[in-house]
């Protein structure tokens, strides 16, 4: 995500978009960090694990995600899933995005 040529406000907006993507994908099924990173890269976001994991930890500490550690092939993977509070937040955000989309593009 970090591009030192981007103004700070643009990086903050992108960080918000990334959080929305995280909520969207974890509402569909649990994801672990590497999967989320790869998914976000498909959307054009370049971010390090040093950026992603603090975002996930913050969403978890705020009660929007829950984490479950699962042993997979001898590795402990941290799977993240959206909570009820996360779904409520996601719905509020998407309502605002729809409103913004109408204003800008219609």
Language-model segment annotations:
Residues 88-106:
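Amphipathic alpha-helical dimerization/coiled-coil segments
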């Amino acid at each position: 995500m970090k591009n030192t040529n981007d103004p700070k406000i643009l990086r903050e907006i992108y960080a918000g978009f990334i959080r929305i993507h995280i909520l969207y994908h974890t509402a569909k099924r649990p994801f672990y960090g590497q999967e989320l990173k790869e998914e976000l890269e498909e959307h054009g976001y370049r971010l390090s694990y040093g950026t992603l994991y603090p975002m996930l930890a913050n969403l978890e500490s705020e009660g929007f995600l829950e984490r479950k550690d699962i042993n997979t092939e001898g590795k402990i993977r941290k799977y993240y899933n959206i909570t009820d509070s996360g779904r409520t937040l996601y719905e509020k955000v998407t309502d605002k995005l729809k409103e913004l989309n109408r204003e800008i593009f219609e």
